[in-house]
Amino acid sequence: MNKKLKLFSMPGAQTSQIVIMLFQSLLHLLEAIASREPTRYIITYSIGNTHTPEIFSYSDLLQSARKAAGALRFKYHVVPGSVVLLHFNDHWNSMLWFWATLIADCIPAMSTPFSNNPETRLRHLKHLSTTLRSPKCLTTASLAAEFAGQEYITPICVQSLDYENLVHLPIKEGGDIAVLMFTSGSSGHCKVVPLTHEQILASLSGKAWTFPLPDNTAQLNWVGMNHVASLVEVHLFSIYTHSDQVHIPTVEVLSHVTLFLDLIHRHRVSRTFAPNFFLAKLRAALSADDTLAKYTGSLSNLRYIVSGGEANVTQTINDLAQMLKKCGAVSNVIVPAFGMTETCAGAIYNTSFPQYDVEHGLPFASVGSCMPGIQVRIVQLNGNGNSVPPGTVGNLEICGPVVLKGYFNDPAATKSTFTNDNWFKTGDLAFVDDNGMLVLAGREKDSIIVNGANYSPHDIESAIDEANIPGLISGFTCCFSTFPPSADTEEVIIVYLPNYTPADTVRRSETAAAIRKVAMMSVGVRATVLPLDRTMLEKSTLGKLARGKIKAAYERGDYKSYQEANEQMMALHHKVSHHQPRSGLEQSLLGVFTRTIPENLTEDFDVLTSIFDLGITSIELLKLKRGIEDLIGHGQIPLITLMTNPTIRTLSDALKQHAQQRDCSIYNPVVVLQSQGKKPPIWLVHPVGGEVMIFMNLAKFIIDRPVYGLRARGFNDGEDPFHTFEEIVSTYHASIKEKQPSGPYAIAGYSYGAKVAFDIAKALEHNGDEVRFLGLLDLPPSLNGTQMRAVAWKEMLLHICRMVGVIREEGIKKIYPRLEPENISPRHAIETVMGEADVTRLAELGLTASALERWANLTHALQRCIVDHKTNGSVAGADAFYCDPMASMAISNEQWACDYIGKWSDHTRSPPRFHHIAGTHYTILDAENIFSFQKTFLRALNDRGI
């Protein structure tokens, strides 16, 4: 293996030299460590499971990545040197496909979570498409819906790549860039940071110089792999130091703060990362009765908690350091640090905290001195580039092997952030004291840092203006951050000019709630909202609000009278409009809410108060989600459910609606797949399997209208399946009219459901209703039950198993011949299928042999209903969606399109519209095809004007 030696010296201090062995690339690093003894491991936990992790050796990672790389090259046909966007929300997929992309000789780009604001999300995706030069994109089926409503980037779900049986792709030298990371930009667009192999390896060697680690210990990470602290500071550094690494989802640690300490003890963790806001929460947790005593002596392996991303309050962190010392950690366990995406995470560390900072009376901790590989200088604020003496605040600039050389495909950003002599301008204000310790003193430009994340106040202001909130005057909104005395983290303030009278408490409350909701949906920050008079919000001659002056006035207390008046008016509003719980569920939810929201905010909270009205943070929102899931006890609640039902009453109604769908005592065909949106709903009719789960992937992409599925009768105990086709149509027609009394209507049916949807449309039109959209998915009008019977029983039974994931595709192929005989009994078929099914998956679904047999019987009953049915009559119009014919049809694509699907023209009073779609009959809505299908489907829906 090729290696090289490099000498580093510690800049700005007495020179000490150390010889560090570097690999030529990250791939060579992984290859070497994977073959090294003793074996080290990657330990990953999942959401809801903090006790039984999945464990992979570094050799497992390498071998799986080589197979996955083969899928990228030979199935996805990536071009060497191109960018592959990786959009995941779990650690293992992020790591696996990061390495697979490198092995495939491509450039991985670590996608950050998308904004909940649709406009912001679309702008971001368009920007990525342009900047990354139309990248390929990998994601999971559960995240595919986040790409809805745009055509800039088309994702592929990794579940469809099926790489396990592929041969290994050999490792070879690739390009200089190892990974692309994203960071915020002043314009609101992210900047793309290319980290090279040489740059990352220099960073890893510098960290190794700074952090000698004990043998047989691990490193712990709880942030996403899209963050440089996770990817470089923990994942790659653990490989470099031949250490175990432990990864756990963020929500688990934030929901149960002391789990952080449990994991440190359980896995002998010696090094981890935590920003200031989390350390403040940890201090509060350890201050509770008996909590500290529980961990006495349990943290003896812990050497370093690196803390960066936001300022560390010396008093707060010192208190925590003393507590951790009682638990067995070293006295200087907390290491305040400075780092950026552009420096491969931490590069300047204070290993003398807290002693140095306490002795020198620093209110915020110093970030210390440089590791090998980076140098700093402080230059005058006037921009002339001259250095300033120790103790003088100036602009912080950096250079060295660990610092990027320029942004990806962004020469303007590169030019603006580098000096003429190639020093990188960080945008931070700082000074170096007489001992060479770096102390940060704020930001050169407007910036908000909350919970370790960096936000542009301009983005928040723009989102509020774009929301057209009735209670404020556009253009007079100002957002800034402040560090209140004795606080542990920054607070976001939003001031605005109201257009209501001061006595209008209803408008005041509604406006504040709307502003907080927009801020949360856009960037996930907590906000204090304050209305001011126009005299307090004067604009410059260029029409701009002076954010700096407004912030200074707020911090001086110039707005104190406005704050007091606002608090009084809001308290009055809550007093006269307080609403009590009206059900046991609302009472239970109220308990969860009040335990999650800070105590000083719970007094005025009621069942009609928006959580955004209380300024709930994104972290508290995740904790609230977990608390409600624990309360209801049946699976996860999508985060968007909480965000779109932000009061106890609306959330209670939403939960009850879902619970009713699980109530087997009353048959109701209507299943709410998506409840939001103001456009007319879309009704989706099941295929011959009778279940609407198949539409779940599609429903994720439809956000502007409710999505209702129609589920067959017969799944639950005591339910008789339908007996006739006419009974199906009349039942569904009545349910549609009850839920949506008037049109225009939008209906679509898949396969068998296409015939049902067609007759429902006829029934609606017969009663004078308008059916503006009728979608017919991959079924010709001429195909009847007799023709379907030969394939439907075995095909649909296997499709059920495939759809719910109890049998993989290779298993389907294996047992298919055993289901060939025409006289095979249902019981024998069920036994054959159950013998091949994944036992664990069956248990997860609660799918027993009897339940599967009931499902098969329902399918058979639905078949009987259509045996003698023939399509007749006509509707105003229709959209027919079709893929290539099944092999069992033994016809050409052209015959299928013209002689079968094309026959719908005989049953429409205007020419039908035909749409060819990807996939096979049973996979058009699967993960690998849903993204392309939903674009075609939603375009057709919109083209019909509904």
From Swiss-Prot:
Belongs to the NRP synthetase family. The keyword Transmembrane helix does not apply. GO terms for molecular function: very long-chain fatty acid-CoA ligase activity. Residues 580-659 form the Carrier domain. The modification O-(pantetheine 4'-phosphoryl)serine is found at S618. It is an enzyme of class 6 (ligase). It catalyses: 2 3-phenylpyruvate + H(+) = phenguignardate + H2O. GO terms for biological process: fatty acid biosynthetic process. Nonribosomal peptide synthetase that mediates the biosynthesis of phenguignardic acid. PngA alone is sufficient for phenguignardic acid synthesis. PngA first activates phenylpyruvic acid (PPA) through its A domain to AMP-PPA. The PPA unit is then loaded to the T domain and eventually transferred to the TE domain. Another PPA unit is then loaded onto the T domain. The TE domain likely promotes the enolate formation on the attached unit, followed by a nucleophilic attack on the carbonyl to yield an ether linkage between the two units. PROSITE patterns: CARRIER. Pfam families: AMP-binding, PP-binding, Thioesterase. Keywords: Ligase, Phosphopantetheine, Phosphoprotein. InterPro entries: AB_hydrolase_fold, ACP-like_sf, AMP-bd_C_sf, AMP-dep_synth/lig_dom, ANL_N_sf, PP-bd_ACP, Thioesterase. Residues 32-450 are annotated as: Adenylation (A) domain. This is Nonribosomal peptide synthetase pngA. It comes from the Eukaryota.
